Amino acid sequence: MRADQLLVHRGLAPTRSAAQRLIDTGAVRWLGPKGWALPRKAGEELPDGCQIEVTDDAELRFVSRGGLKLDAALAHCGVDASGANCLDVGQSTGGFTDALLQRGAARVVGLDVGRGQLAASLAGDARVTPHEGLNARDVAGSAFAQQEPTHSFDIVVADLSFITLTHVLPTIATWLAPAGHAVLLVKPQFELQPEDIGKGGLVKHASAYPRVEKRIRDACEALGLTVRDYFASPVTGGDGNREFFVWACPGAESA
């Protein structure tokens, strides 16, 4: 049986995707003829009756790896989510939403261009209000825009792919409260030009990262958001690219 399927079958992981995360991070081992070994990949065939165990279940704390990233970023910034009204831009399966709720957020509103991706545990949570099929770049006339007052969210978070963060910053700035915090994931591969990206979607040269930082800082400041910090994600991405967070607030001193 495949290693990821075996983990689910044994009740050691809730889903195959969760099992794959555990395997990818080296948190699974199985007892083979030569002793304990790590599965090389999720699809590795293992004996159905073999002894297998999870050595570190940190990957399962949240519905996706994104939760680990945001949880670490909020700790880095010292942003307290207790009782906060939050907006999650690019909600997807809800890793960021899960992290906010586990840190005490009172409510999380989500925006995502996709549909049917939010984890069932979050979709059924009364504290979560998802708006699916909505591009955060243009929310005018949407149910979200009609229901949520502008400048009403204490914390805005974002995790976006295949679009530059700068395209959704106007929406973020419009709905962020005057004393709020924006903690946004920056993925350089979506901020650079095609010539900067190599095989497998990886950024070719580390020298491109300062250009991305300047682009994000300039875009924030043009919208009245002052950057408090710009830092490498404490938890690495899964595709080999470096990721960063920008922490910005209205009317604060630049860092």
Model-derived features with residue positions:
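S4-like RNA-binding module at protein N-termini
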Residues: 17-72, 76-79
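Conserved class I S-adenosyl-L-methionine
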Residues: 81-92, 100, 109
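Short alpha-helix
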Residues: 209-223
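Core SAM-dependent methyltransferase catalytic element
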Residues: 234-255
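Short, glycine-/aromatic-enriched active-site segment of Class I SAM-dependent methyltransferases
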Residues: 188-205
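A short glycine-rich, Lys/Arg-flanked "PGG" loop and its adjoining helix->strand segment in the class I
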Residues: 166-183
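S-adenosyl-L-methionine
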Residues: 109-167
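Residues at the N-terminus of the alpha-helix immediately C-terminal to the conserved SAM/SAH-binding loop
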Residues: 92-97, 114
